[in-house]
């Protein structure tokens, strides 16, 4: 909110500099965006009196003006269509600086000397959104009592200082001058002179005879009140009122509309004025809109309403989008003679949603969203009615018509002096604490050291003991709180088991040639459900996504990595090996919030080894990916057996080149080639992926680490080639060899696989090297042969293999 320092001075005897006040507000109440004066960067702008005008001899749109600038009468050439003699105007003298840092010089225009410039508001820094529309095409006229030669700034409110506050969601009371006055008075210990104007009901008619209000659902409008002002004349507002508005960033429109905006700024109470004669019925109500119900708002935009929008109705016809924007059909115009004035409190959540839905974020909707002071609804309505009557020459009808009225909620909270001093580290006494609450306007009851506080309804952000402690701290002064270092022994820091796992995972995979990638956690609904380790329900959806590409939380890391691969491939980087460690979000039907799981995934495409003089190129295949996963899991030192089980059911994966990864009997991930159609959809070549659930790896039992001396005795190896059924897996053979290999078998290595010609149908050949070694002595040939023969016999019995 843009807070006028001069307006504050009307209500508070404050003598601190605006910059110092802004710093105090920032340290005590809310953040500050900016502190500025509307005249910043401008100079040599004075009041001028147009003594006479004559047409330019060589132009049909320029005028020669003789202007009294206080000391001299100078000629100024002006192109504004509304320039006339006898008016006080804004004059930029030679050497003046106007908006956009433009310097004014003496010049000739079509051969005629011009010693300055007559200015419109937009030319001296006013934005197009603030300058009154009546002067869009012309210069601004100053009051008749303005003295030629004087600075124009005081006449336009440009000598004021504006403090632009950035209000947090919990301090909606600060969206008003009243809220700012209350807070500033509290932390400076000042007495407020806030003025409330009383209403004079000088019409003989009763409001209840002119309009009726029936609120069927008070959830939509907990408070709704209305007054009627008759026999008014709609015209331009007085300059003082326009200054209040444009210094707050609001465009003056007319006396009726300007009063509602002025009261909005003063009390934080949004009001809406209807042209009484244009109301289609005199029965006012509030209801939900009908789905796709048409409605034209004040901005002349026809909108299709949603069934969750709130509308104010006359009869059953919508006349306003409640709390957001009025309707064009009942808008105030120059022909308006009677005004129906609304003051209400609407449901803040519904107002926020409909403002977002229709992209109508107004001063009113912002206040309804943050909260409106229920104490001043009627006060604001009365003052607005009186001002409209005074400025429009009308009369206020007798009484207020009330459709609904919410009871004031004033929480009572108890706390003790010892608790206050314990939490804040202070040594306050009861009198000092009570003084702070008195300055805040909070009523107190004292019982020894026990203090019971009644919070006024205007401070709806204060509800519990912690809120009161915060109020004491900020009014006492955060800078005055004692600073005490915690007393504790220092401990040597260490990584948690989770942190160590994540760090180790990164080191291992980077050592295996993969580069780390970080992808968006949000993606499309389709991609969010792809490549799940275990199938789950639908992904978590965002209510208000940034874009259609970021609507759901990922349930796998792989889709993000494939997007990264596609990005690289599109830029001619075809050899891509990436990994990502991050969280996925798994939804469960019986839980409101998704479960966050730490996962690890990798993706490989292109060549692992490039073609050069001493080695041929090697394209990534399933076994490269499997080797990386095996090496990684070996480094994790898991006690349970790691197994790879073929899976033909994963729809995003190649049915013949995919395996699930198990830790013991628990599914921990999967590995394989992505389905060719999926690769085509992502516009990438043949690609292999894997994903592991790190939560399971973290929870799994680990082997105890111990170090073993390297044997100084020689090793002996034996090779064996087996002819076996093609359905028998390498894992089965390795398990059998290790089972019967004996205590001295230290390594088994598969060095050849052959399938094809010269072999019987449905057969394949696997060749292994078995290495034997003893750390205590040299093995004999007989010892090795005995162990090797046991392996051969066992393989022959179990798998019906033929030794080649």
Regions found by a protein language model. Name each.
Residues 413, 417, 421-574, 771-773, ...:
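Extended, well-folded interaction surfaces typified by the phenylalanyl-tRNA synthetase beta subunit core
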Residues 188-214, 394-419:
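Terminal amphipathic helices with adjacent charged low-complexity linkers/tails
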Residues 2, 27, 439-442, 595, ...:
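A carboxyl-terminal module marker
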Residues 39-43, 201, 490, 495, ...:
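Beta-rich nucleic-acid/ligand-interaction surfaces
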Residues 63, 193-294, 608:
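Glycine/proline-enriched, intrinsically flexible loops and inter-domain linkers
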Residues 47-77, 254, 260-329:
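Conserved mixed alpha/beta core segments that line enzyme active sites in large multi-domain catalysts
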Residues 1-198, 373-374, 380:
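Phosphate-backbone binding interfaces of nucleic-acid-interacting proteins
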């Amino acid at each position: 909110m843009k807070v006028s320092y001069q307006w504050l001075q009307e209500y508070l005897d404050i003598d601190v500099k605006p910059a110092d006040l802004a710093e105090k507000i920032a340290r005590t109440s809310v953040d500050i965006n900016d502190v500025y004066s509307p005249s910043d960067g401008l100079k040599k702008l004075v009041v001028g009196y147009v003594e006479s005008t004559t047409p330019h001899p060589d132009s049909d749109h320029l005028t020669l003006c003789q202007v009294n600038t206080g000391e001299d009468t100078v000629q100024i050439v002006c192109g504004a269509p509304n320039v006339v003699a006898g008016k006080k105007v804004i004059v930029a003298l030679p050497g003046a600086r106007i908006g956009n840092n433009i310097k004014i010089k003496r010049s000739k225009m079509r051969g005629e000397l011009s010693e300055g410039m007559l200015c419109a508001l937009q030319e001296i820094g006013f934005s197009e959104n603030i300058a009154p529309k009546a002067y869009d095409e012309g210069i601004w006229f100053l009051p008749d009592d303005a003295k030629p030669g004087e600075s124009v700034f005081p006449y336009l409110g440009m000598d004021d200082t504006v403090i632009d506050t950035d209000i947090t969601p919990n301090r909606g009371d600060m969206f008003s001058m009243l809220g700012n006055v209350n807070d500033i008075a509290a932390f400076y210990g000042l007495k407020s002179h806030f003025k409330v104007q009383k209403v004079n009901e000088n019409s003989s008619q009763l409001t209840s005879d002119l309009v009726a209000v029936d609120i069927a659902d008070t959830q939509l409008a907990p408070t709704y009140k209305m007054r009627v002002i008759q026999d008014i004349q709609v015209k331009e507002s007085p300059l003082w009122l326009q200054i209040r508005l444009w210094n707050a960033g609001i465009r003056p429109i007319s006396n009726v509309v300007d009063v509602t905006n002025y009261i909005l700024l003063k009390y934080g109470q949004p009001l809406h004025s209807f042209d009484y004669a244009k109301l289609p019925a005199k029965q006012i109500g509030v209801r939900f809109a009908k789905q796709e119900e048409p409605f034209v708002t004040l901005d002349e935009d026809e909108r299709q309403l949603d069934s969750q929008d709130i509308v104010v109705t006359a009869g059953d016809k919508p006349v306003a989008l409640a709390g957001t924007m009025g309707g064009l059909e009942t808008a105030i115009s120059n022909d308006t003679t009677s005004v129906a004035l609304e003051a209400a409190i609407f449901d803040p959540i519904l107002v926020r949603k409909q403002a977002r839905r229709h992209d109508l974020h107004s001063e009113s909707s912002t206040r309804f969203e943050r909260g409106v002071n229920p104490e001043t609804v009627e006060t604001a309505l009365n003052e607005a009615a009186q001002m409209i009557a005074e400025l429009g020459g009308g009369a206020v009808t007798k009484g207020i018509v009330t459709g609904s009225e919410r009871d004031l909620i004033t929480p009572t909270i108890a706390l003790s002096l010892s608790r206050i001093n314990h939490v804040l580290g202070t040594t306050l006494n009861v009198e000092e604490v009570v003084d702070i609450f008195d300055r805040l306007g909070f009523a107190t009851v004292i019982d020894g050291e026990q203090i019971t506080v009644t919070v006024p309804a205007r401070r709806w952000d204060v509800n519990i003991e912690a809120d009161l402690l915060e109020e004491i701290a900020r009014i006492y002064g955060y800078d005055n709180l004692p600073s005490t270092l915690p007393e504790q022994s220092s401990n040597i820091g260490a990584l948690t088991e989770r942190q160590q796992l994540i760090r180790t995972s990164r080191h291992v995979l980077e050592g295996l040639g993969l580069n780390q990638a970080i992808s968006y956690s949000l993606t499309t609904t389709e991609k969010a459900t792809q490549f799940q380790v275990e199938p789950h329900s639908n992904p978590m959806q965002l209510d208000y996504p940034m874009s259609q590409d970021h609507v759901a939380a990922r349930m796998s890391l792989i889709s993000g990595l494939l997007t990264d691969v596609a990005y690289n491939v599109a830029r001619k980087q075809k050899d891509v090996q990436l990994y990502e460690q991050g969280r996925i979000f798994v939804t469960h039907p019986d839980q409101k919030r998704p479960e966050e799981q730490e996962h690890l995934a990798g993706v490989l495409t292109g060549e692992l080894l490039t073609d050069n003089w001493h080695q041929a190129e090697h394209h990534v295949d399933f076994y490269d990916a499997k080797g990386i996963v095996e090496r990684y899991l070996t480094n994790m030192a898991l006690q349970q057996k790691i197994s790879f089980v073929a899976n033909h059911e994963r729809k995003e994966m190649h049915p013949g080149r995919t395996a699930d990864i198990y830790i013991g009997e628990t599914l921990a991930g999967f590995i394989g080639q992505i389905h060719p159609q999926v690769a085509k959809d992502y516009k990438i070549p043949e690609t292999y992926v894997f994903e592991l659930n790190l939560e399971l790896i973290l929870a799994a039992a680990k082997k105890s680490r111990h170090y073993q001396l390297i044997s100084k005795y020689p090793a002996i190896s034996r090779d064996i080639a087996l002819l076996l059924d093609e359905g028998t897996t390498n894992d089965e053979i390795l398990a059998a060899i290790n089972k019967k290999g004996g205590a001295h078998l230290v390594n088994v290595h598969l060095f050849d696989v052959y399938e094809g010609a010269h072999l019987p149908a449905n057969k394949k050949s696997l060749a292994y090297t078995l290495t034997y070694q003893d750390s205590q002595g040299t093995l004999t040939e007989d010892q090795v042969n005995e162990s090797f023969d046991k392996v051969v016999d066992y393989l022959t019995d179990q798998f019906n293999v033929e030794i080649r």
